[in-house]
Amino acid sequence: MVRFTLYQVNLYTDARGNKLIHTILQYLNENLSKSTLTLKKIAEINYVNPSYLSRIFKEVTQMNFVDYLATLRIEKAKRLLQTGNLRIYEIAESVGISDPNYFSKLFKKYTNMTPAQYKEEIHRQEDF
């Protein structure tokens, strides 16, 4: 889902000549492990008003900034749960969330499973 959105954004920003969102999406992907990623901080880095950034971000991605960032984090966490032997708190930290309890709640909100349930389901599918 996120990759498709990135593709759409590339087409949109190239067509309009507006590289701001494309630049921000690249920054988010490259800095996902930082817990300081906020709309306000990203707006400051790019010298734009947070309200303007919020509006244009949603226009381009069809998602608000918070949901987009959470989706990126959850997708990366899912990959880490599938491929690694990291503990939940290590995965949380690697996607920029310092509180493992909050990470578990966020993960469940977006996947309807806890990280442990997701990992168990992946291993169950691999056994078949």
Task: Provide a role label for each language-model segment.
Residues 20-24, 28, 69-70, 74:
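Generic hydrophobic, amphipathic alpha-helix propensity
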Residues 9, 111, 115, 119-126:
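C-terminal alpha-helix/helix-terminus motif
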Residues 3-13, 25-37, 57-61, 78-86, ...:
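Basic, amphipathic alpha-helical hairpins
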Residues 40-69, 94-114:
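Basic/polar phosphate-binding segments, predominantly the helix-turn-helix DNA-binding elements
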Residues 59-98, 120-128:
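Terminal helix-turn-helix DNA-binding modules in bacterial transcription factors
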